[in-house]
Curated annotation (Swiss-Prot):
Its EC number is 2.3.1.225. Belongs to the DHHC palmitoyltransferase family. PFA3 subfamily. The DHHC domain is required for palmitoyltransferase activity. Its main location: membrane. It catalyses: L-cysteinyl-[protein] + hexadecanoyl-CoA = S-hexadecanoyl-L-cysteinyl-[protein] + CoA. GO terms for molecular function: protein-cysteine S-palmitoyltransferase activity. This is Palmitoyltransferase PFA3. Residues 42-56, 193-220 are lumenal. Residues 351-367 have a biased composition (Low complexity).
């Protein structure tokens, strides 16, 4: 037991350390890369015999891209992903939640924005977070690292020490692409220096093969060239994947997991088919690649490259999203089919029960059969004779002829 507590404590402190250390590493690498790219390479006149103006402009462009990377990084961390608990009526008071849990037949009233929700939890009901004690709108999930529910949750990024969600998704995608561009800028400048250095070694090699008099290349330049190549491949791949998700209007969670949609018959009731999901009927939030891109990056082309968010009127507040009408129609058809199957099966079960009751009544063994019914009739002759006998004689109809 003590060992488990130590493991949890160690994990907690490692997470806190990484949360504080990794953002420093990211910003340091960006600043260091700009310094090496601009000052040690592009602004070094000895490295280039001609086109010094081009390389100086090239260096300034790389620094501008690096500054944009830092601005986007700060935007991702400062703006945050957004949480449903920050929106009115989505948080439930603790006393009201406790009363609803303790009293039978008492239910919590969801906000009006939840009336049009298309996503459902496993039991078919509206999605509710018992950790945050609040309602979860479509595409929202609870992040254990962020310790809150996140609007349009994508993933938790330790390099930013925050979650990526509805409000900072655009900044995150732009950051990936600007870092990729910066890597290619640095790779171009350092690669050109390295290439010239190789040519210089070949041209100045003496008859004895001695190259001691050839100028040495900077260690910073070599390290930057290697890191730029590695990060260009890694971050570039992730940036391409993120842009693919933007065009499909999907988050990383929705790409990896199936989203269950609401049905007319919740799973908690007596169901006969599986509820419709994103894998069976399609992505209901996919409204076309162009509109999907505009919802995240903005309506105007100049907004696509700048850290400027579209207006809330254009993209909403993260609780409701435009829906694909064709997929929505499939969800409704699946719900109607489920209701039809349920009604047919319930009618069949009712009919079978009635037939079973009749069969049980007529198929009893002989010794369990009820005795013949006895009927009582008036004996008119005995009544007329005046004899002292009962006025009613018991006559068994089965024995009468």
């Amino acid at each position: 037991m003590q060992c488990r507590k130590c493991c949890f404590a160690c994990e907690k402190w490692c997470f806190i350390g990484a949360k504080a250390f990794l953002p420093l590493v990211v910003n340091f690498l960006i600043i260091w890369a700009c310094w090496v790219h601009a000052w040690l390479v592009c602004w070094e006149p000895q490295l280039f015999e001609s086109d010094t103006t081009f390389w100086r402009v090239y260096g300034v462009a790389g620094v501008a891209i690096g500054i944009m990377c830092n601005v986007l990084y700060l935007k991702v961390c400062k703006v945050g992903p957004g949480s449903p608990t920050d929106i009115d009526n989505f948080s439930v008071p603790l006393v009201e939640y406790q009363n609803a849990c303790s009293a039978e037949g008492q239910h919590l009233t969801p906000p009006r924005e939840m009336a049009n929700s298309v996503c459902a939890k496993e039991n078919g009901g509206l999605r509710f977070c018992t950790k945050c004690i609040g309602w979860k709108p479509d595409r929202s999930h609870h992040c254990s690292n962020y310790k809150r529910c996140v609007l349009k949750f994508d993933h938790y990024c330790p390099w930013f020490a925050t979650a990526i969600g509805f409000h900072n998704h655009k900044y995150f995608v732009l950051f990936l692409w600007y870092v990729t561009i910066l890597c290619f800028f640095c790779l171009g400048s350092t690669g050109f220096v390295f290439y010239n250095h190789i040519l210089e070694i070949g041209a100045m090699r003496g008859p004895d093969g001695n190259t001691d008099y050839v100028g040495a290349i900077s260690v910073n330049v070599m390290i930057l060239m290697v890191l730029a190549l590695v990060f260009a491949i890694a971050v570039g791949t992730f940036a391409t994947f993120s842009l693919y998700l933007v065009f499909n209007n999907q988050s990383t969670v929705e790409f990896l997991e199936s989203t269950q949609y609401r049905s007319a018959v919740p799973t908690a009731a007596y169901r006969y088919t599986f509820a419709p999901t994103s894998k069976t009927v399609g992505n209901v939030f996919d409204v076309g690649w162009k509109r999907n891109f505009q919802l995240v990056m903005g309506d105007k082309w100049w907004m696509w490259l700048l850290p400027i968010q579209p207006s809330e009127a254009a993209r909403g507040n993260g609780t409701q999203f435009p829906l694909n009408k064709q997929v929505l129609q499939k969800i409704r058809e699946a719900a109607a089919k489920e209701v039809q199957i349920r009604d047919q099966n319930q009618a069949y079960i009712k009919q079978q029960r009635q037939q079973q009751q009749k069969r049980t009544q007529y198929d009893l063994p002989q010794h369990l059969q009820p005795p013949p019914q006895e009927h009582y009739e008036y004996d008119d002759e005995a009544q007329d004779s005046g004899d002292d006998i009962p006025l009613i004689n018991m006559v068994n109809k089965n024995n009468t002829k």
